[in-house]
Curated annotation (Swiss-Prot):
Composition bias, Basic and acidic residues: 146-198, 222-242
Naturally occurring in which organism (per UniProt): Giardia intestinalis (strain ATCC 50803 / WB clone C6) (Giardia lamblia)
Cysteines engaged in disulfide bonds, as pairs: none
Top-level lineage group: Eukaryota
Function: Component of the intraflagellar transport complex B (IFT-B) involved in flagellar assembly.
Keywords for this protein: Cell projection, Cilium, Cilium biogenesis/degradation, Coiled coil, Cytoplasm, Cytoskeleton, Flagellum
Name the UniProt record assigns to this protein: Intraflagellar transport protein 54
GO cellular component entries: 9+2 motile cilium; axoneme; ciliary basal body; ciliary pocket collar; ciliary tip; intraciliary transport particle B
Cellular compartment(s): Cell projection, Cilium, Flagellum; Cytoplasm, Cytoskeleton, Flagellum axoneme; Cytoplasm, Cytoskeleton, Flagellum basal body
Ranges annotated as spanning the membrane: none
Gene Ontology molecular function, alphabetical: microtubule binding
Length: 465
């Protein structure tokens, strides 16, 4: 199978062998022509046709890189001036031994320019006697020109199709790789943004919950004794926090639980309700009981004044002016009364003092001294709470605004991502259009080149005739 490079080498050999015989035109040398080989070809062509100019080729060898560049620039300029077509080749590529197809095209154009120069130099001489015969033979020349154009057009179309096929495959591969890379980057960026958004939402919810929910103080646990059970057995009582409650008295029944090794001694109850039992065996007892029942309803109560101050509201004063029991009560009632009197004596330290049920002015003074700072503290705390409520509302509003701004930012980022993808697609389409224009321009250059070649062939055939 003949490749494009092999075909170019053969066409180069065909174009140069009509002009020169040395240096040898071999496929090995033309597969990657060195600079010395190109210099020898230019010198041989110049000696045979006078093109390029002998002054520009008057070198045995050129070793300096700048001089080589100047020599190639001069040769390319002369070819362009002679043919009127620019030579599509890079001098650096020729010196480096790269881009061999363009180097071979330059050599072919060198041969064509030399042939054209030779024809023009011969046409400047007096025309030969057979000139009328040439004018008569013009129709066959037109046919040859048409055949040459057709052949060049077919060759050009074939090369153009091959080039377009290669470019199309390369563009498809690059486009596919770019789309996959963009898709992967977009997915990774969206996952990262979604994860970050979820974390921020969770943090905001936690902050809002912590700001809204008040800090509750742990309940205090106390114990109270039960009259119906033993002293050692206690039941836990949960004391709820409340405000505007007067401080407890010194002899309050409630006490905090302390870790002690021995159980505390039982304290006497502050108040006992004793129901009088009627005895039918004694008429005197029945009469006394009936008399007492008419006075106080059949019940005798021993009251603790401090307990009354703590438990009873201030609107219900306790009246302790009940008449003392007479000495003619029964034995059971007498024992109960003696027990109550002994309890009062043990509690107040003096038997002559009777419980009044109301706190004295002396007992209220320490309570007032403690209650006033507590009330001030409560009022200060209430004022601080009232002042902090607007700030809490503003903080909630700020949280809502921040959440809205984050949502808008997320929407804007999505819009920017879409715009970026659209711009990338437009850029790829512009690149494709640019490649198509370049391919068309290249095909036009090839057409011009084929037309020039056909013109040279026609001139050569004219000279042969």
């Amino acid at each position: 199978m003949i490749t494009i490079e092999t075909e170019l080498i053969n066409s180069t050999i065909d174009a140069l062998k009509e002009l020169i015989s040395r240096p040898p035109l071999t496929e090995k040398l033309l597969s990657r022509p060195p600079f010395k080989y190109i210099l020898d070809i230019c010198k041989a062509v110049s000696a045979a046709t006078g093109f390029p100019s002998p002054e520009s080729c008057n070198y045995d060898d050129i070793t300096d890189r700048e001089e080589r560049t100047a020599f190639l620039t001069s040769i390319i300029g002369q070819i362009t001036d002679q043919l009127g077509v620019p030579v599509d080749v890079q001098i650096k590529s020729i010196l480096a031994g790269k881009d061999v197809p363009k180097t071979l095209r330059m050599l072919v154009m060198l041969a064509q320019a030399a042939k054209l120069f030779k024809v023009r130099s011969n046409s400047s001489q007096p025309p030969p006697q057979q000139a009328p015969r040439e004018t008569v033979a013009s129709p066959p020349q037109e046919d040859l020109e048409a055949l040459a154009r057709e052949k060049a057009e077919k060759e050009r179309q074939r090369r153009e199709q091959e080039q377009q096929e290669r470019e199309r495959k390369e563009r498809e591969r690059q486009e596919k790789e770019r789309e996959e890379r963009e898709k992967h980057e977009l997915e990774s960026r969206e996952r990262a943004e979604a994860e970050q958004w979820k974390q921020k939402q969770q943090q905001q919810q936690q902050q809002q919950q912590s700001a809204i929910s008040p800090q509750k103080s742990p309940p205090k646990v106390r114990f109270a004794d039960d009259d119906k059970t033993r002293v050692e057995e206690h039941q836990p009582v949960i004391e709820r926090p409340h405000f505007n409650r007067p401080p407890p008295s010194q002899h309050s029944r409630r006490m905090a639980v302390t870790a002690t090794s021995e159980p505390s001694a039982p304290q006497p109850s502050a108040m006992r309700l004793v129901k009088v039992v009627r005895e039918e065996s004694s008429d005197e007892s029945n009469q006394d009981l009936n008399q007492n029942a008419g006075q106080d309803g059949g019940f005798t109560m021993g009251l603790d004044a401090e307990w009354c101050d703590e438990m009873l509201p201030g609107e219900f004063p306790l009246d302790t002016g009940a008449p003392a029991p007479s000495s003619t009560h029964g034995e059971l009632v007498a024992n109960i009364l003696d027990t109550a009197e002994a309890y009062n004596v043990a509690l107040h330290g003096d038997g002559s003092k009777k419980p009044t049920g109301l706190s004295t002015q002396r007992d209220k003074k320490p309570i007032d001294s403690y209650s006033q700072p507590v009330q001030k503290l409560i009022s200060h705390i209430s004022a601080i709470i009232r002042k902090s409520v607007p700030y809490a509302k503003h903080t909630a509003f700020l949280d809502e605004h921040i959440l809205t701004m984050r949502t808008e930012l997320h929407t804007a980022s999505e819009a920017v991502t879409k715009l970026l993808s659209t711009s990338l697609k437009q850029e790829s389409s512009l690149k494709q259009a640019n490649n198509a224009c370049e391919s068309k321009l290249h095909s036009l250059k090839e057409q011009i080149y084929s037309l020039r070649q056909a013109q040279l062939e026609l001139l050569h055939s004219t000279l042969a005739l």
